[in-house]
Amino acid sequence: MGVGDGRDQYELAAMSEQSGKKKSKNKKEKKEKDMDELKKEVDLDDHKLSLEELHHKYGTDLSKGLSNSRAEEILARDGPNALTPPPTTPEWVKFCKQMFGGFSMLLWTGAVLCFLAYGILAAMEDEPANDNLYLGVVLSAVVIITGCFSYYQDAKSSKIMDSFKNLVPQQALVVRDGEKKQINAEEVVIGDLVEVKGGDRIPADLRIISSHGCKVDNSSLTGESEPQTRSPDFSNDNPLETKNIAFFSTNCVEGTARGIVISTGDRTVMGRIATLASGLEVGRTPISIEIEHFIHIITGVAVFLGVSFLLLSLVLGYSWLEAVIFLIGIIVANVPEGLLATVTVCLTLTAKRMAKKNCLVKNLEAVETLGSTSTICSDKTGTLTQNRMTVAHMWFDNQIHEADTTENQSGTSFDRSSDTWASLARIAGLCNRAVFLAEQIDVPILKRDVAGDASESALLKCIELCCGSVKEMREKFTKVAEIPFNSTNKYQLSVHKIPSGGKESQHLLVMKGAPERILDRCATIMIQGKEQLLDDEIKESFQNAYLELGGLGERVLGFCHFYLPDEQFPEGFQFDADDVNFPTENLCFVGLMSMIDPPRAAVPDAVGKCRSAGIKVIMVTGDHPITAKAIAKGVGIISEGNETVEDIAARLNIPVNEVNPRDAKACVVHGGDLKDLSCEQLDDILKYHTEIVFARTSPQQKLIIVEGCQRTGAIVAVTGDGVNDSPALKKADIGVAMGIAGSDVSKQAADMILLDDNFASIVTGVEEGRLIFDNLKKSIAYTLTSNIPEITPFLFFIIANIPLPLGTVTILCIDLGTDMLPAISLAYEAAESDIMKRQPRNPKTDKLVNERLISIAYGQIGMIQALAGFFTYFVILAENGFLPPRLLGIRMNWDDKYINDLEDSYGQQWTYEQRKIVEFTCHTAFFTSIVIVQWADLIICKTRRNSVFQQGMKNKILIFGLFEETALAAFLSYCPGMDVALRMYPLKPNWWFCAFPYSLLIFIYDEIRKLILRRNPGGWMERETYY
């Protein structure tokens, strides 16, 4: 296999077999890379190859590297080692989406129709009325203002790739033609021989060929918090788990390594995640689907009414032009002009309220999505847990002791009086390379930053808390020799000089490491400060303790020591750590210490609240199944008494395959098994198990899990903080990133950021989301109701030929004036009592606007409001001499400018000017009547099920809204000059009271309806009227 085969081979390695067949022939094909391909597991085989095979595959000399000329050829062939930026949406397109999307389109249609109607009138008459022109201008202004507002609020942009750019290391050290040289990381090519050292970012995916104590931090990729050892050994079939592959853009924490580049740029594992995250089609938010559904209903009603009356007016003998003007009038009267602004303001208010509770919302519509969430897929590390390893248990003196893992050290403490504990603490402090960073004297011990790996940091903090300064301990026992931890012997050892006055020895050897390895090196054990022989009974006791702590998902370390005899190791003896010249066998075992990343304090309560709100919480983690299961039990994701298949098998003492999976409510799925599951099998797991943990998952699998949940009809929220979470965050209905620990990439992909990294904040978000949905329903019910008293005058004007009871300008004053603040005030309404006790809404059946809401608003309350308006209208005209029978069919003469002697019911003659003043006074009175009946409507819309008396009148904004709409109506009626500007005339005080009985009727009618609802849950009234 010669050098020339390289291209085919590494394509296969980086992209999996299928994509190897479909080589990217040109840029277009490269862009349309099959997303399903990216979702598959990384299919590398380079970690299985011997060094000889590697040399053949890549044509690289393992000591001299590639030649410069060969590297240039490969660079020309493959392009730079960089991530391809995704196509971004230009800002003007985003602006246009706000201007012409969804609800705005309805208003634009209304505006265009108004201009059209004005144009028709202008062509027909010399002095056309300006009403339609005003209406068109106002509608356009409403859309433009709210569009700009939304655009500024919604600054969610596709910066995902920008933050990936920050992950690209700037420089790389390569060996070419036998010489080491620093080059720009973008120039690294497949087959390059690269050297990395502690502190470097890895410039591409490498196959390690030699290493020296090398550890890498893979947390941004796999979610594992512990640094991972890297060596030339092939240790696992899974390329993400094996020790001989280091990944692009992860960090080398310590040691050095040399490796051959096996993939660059978009073909690296990180590149695949980047392409996956930026290429995912993001679904629409539930609220945008709801608003579209609502627009369809409103448009449907408007067009149906418009066309019906167009035909009716033609039958009644009106001309075509008049009929079209009527059609336009009816359609425009149906458009709730103020609703777009109301919805935007409601969402913004909630977003601000959530920001105060540590939830930063990037996308306004995401506010509501969280409320409809039915499944939360949560990352473990840092979200459910504190993201700091902490000593949880010790085993010494033949018993397990529990340490305090609470964040504020408020838990129980163990007995520290034993001499064995003193020895154990000394070993943990001395055989430990972690140190506190400088200048942190005032910082509490648990919050201090440490240089060193997670386990050693946990030991350092534990000993500092329990025994005082570790630094002083180390100064007292000076270190004279050390063997650092390595993966072959799995222990770390150091020799220390005992301060003068030591017992029979001047030197103490201390060792820690994998418990079984440490125990094998011991002949005695310390119990109550005294050494005794290690017999089978104690070994069994050790084994039980080790299994118990391991079963809790904890990382267990063993500790032993040995006093080196003076006759063999006198003062000044030269200890040699390379060619070991001191004993490492027959030591004295002291004890075990186990560490875990403990759950956050508020999480169990939050998980409980999710459960009572009908939300399923699934844990998805890159960590080990045992640890994941232990934390899941600790926080209540797996509740007490619920068993997995393995638990049932252990209890009944039968093989796992004999247990019926449906008997187990809980289940822990290993990423390795998930790979082999079909979509149907995954769907079954998600459907039939109520409590699920996915462990050892890869980024692609997180995405597959989210898609599985969505297939089963769930609305999914995903929390995460690593780069590995970004595809899932982007795909979820709502992605929630961590503000403190989260990587830039995850924050860009998410819709919401938890500023305090606390899972409990999500529950607050869910409550706020449900509340906004409820309150938007109430707001829409309130706004739509006044549509009926706005439309019916127009219909009677056409059918009964009466003078127009309500003009276009007055309709605008209601929709954009008096109704605005009350509708927005409903966003401040407190939650009804059952908000976190009910199941998540079903997006298919529980709509924002459903038939029942339309029936209540239009068919019931709206009709009573229309009666109130007509009652006032007929009262005023009757007082002026026109009794109802006289009004029928009078319209043609009434609107004729040249008739100045029209007789009323009593024979008085009216000029055109006088008639119009009475007509405009009627418009004003009809308008004030709507305001008065809207008082009752606003109060009944406060609740959907509870009585207003139960809910109370605590919403100050709503009370202010009631006064504001009344004051505005009075101002428009009585302010001098309004008769010219808006054709609104002052009213007699008694005309205000005509609508009061109707307002009272609305209130009583609705209170009785809600009483029946509460008395007969699920009954006819609920089925027909509960919206």
UniProtKB/Swiss-Prot annotation:
Belongs to the cation transport ATPase (P-type) (TC 3.A.3) family. Type IIC subfamily. This is Sodium/potassium-transporting ATPase subunit alpha-1. It comes from the Eukaryota. The gene is atp1a1. Mg(2+) binds at residues 721, 725. It is an enzyme of class 7 (translocase). It is found in: Cell membrane, Sarcolemma. GO terms for molecular function: ATP binding; ATP hydrolysis activity; metal ion binding; P-type sodium:potassium-exchanging transporter activity. Residues 1-5 form a propeptide. Keywords: ATP-binding, Cell membrane, Ion transport, Magnesium, Membrane, Metal-binding, Nucleotide-binding, Phosphoprotein, Potassium, Potassium transport, Sodium, Sodium transport, Sodium/potassium transport, Translocase, Transmembrane, Transmembrane helix, Transport. Gene3D superfamilies: Calcium-transporting ATPase, cytoplasmic domain N, Calcium-transporting ATPase, cytoplasmic transduction domain A, Calcium-transporting ATPase, transmembrane domain, HAD superfamily/HAD-like. Residues 112-134, 312-323, 797-806, 871-922, 975-989 are extracellular. Residues 1-10, 29-39 have a biased composition (Basic and acidic residues). The sodium/potassium-transporting ATPase is composed of a catalytic alpha subunit, an auxiliary non-catalytic beta subunit and an additional regulatory subunit. NCBIfam families: ATPase-IIC_X-K, ATPase_P-type. This is the catalytic component of the active enzyme, which catalyzes the hydrolysis of ATP coupled with the exchange of sodium and potassium ions across the plasma membrane. This action creates the electrochemical gradient of sodium and potassium ions, providing the energy for active transport of various nutrients. It catalyses: K(+)(out) + Na(+)(in) + ATP + H2O = K(+)(in) + Na(+)(out) + ADP + phosphate + H(+). GO terms for cellular component: membrane; plasma membrane; sarcolemma. Residues 85-87 are annotated as: Interaction with phosphoinositide-3 kinase. Signal peptide: none annotated. Its EC number is 7.2.2.13. Its main location: membrane. The chain crosses the membrane at residues 91-111, 135-155, 292-311, 324-341, 777-796, 807-827, 848-870, 923-942, 956-974, 990-1010. InterPro entries: ATPase_P-typ_cation-transptr_C (IPR006068), ATPase_P-typ_cation-transptr_N (IPR004014), ATPase_P-typ_cyto_dom_N (IPR023299), ATPase_P-typ_P_site (IPR018303), ATPase_P-typ_TM_dom_sf (IPR023298), ATPase_P-typ_transduc_dom_A_sf (IPR008250), Cation_transp_ATPase_P-type (IPR050510), HAD-like_sf (IPR036412).
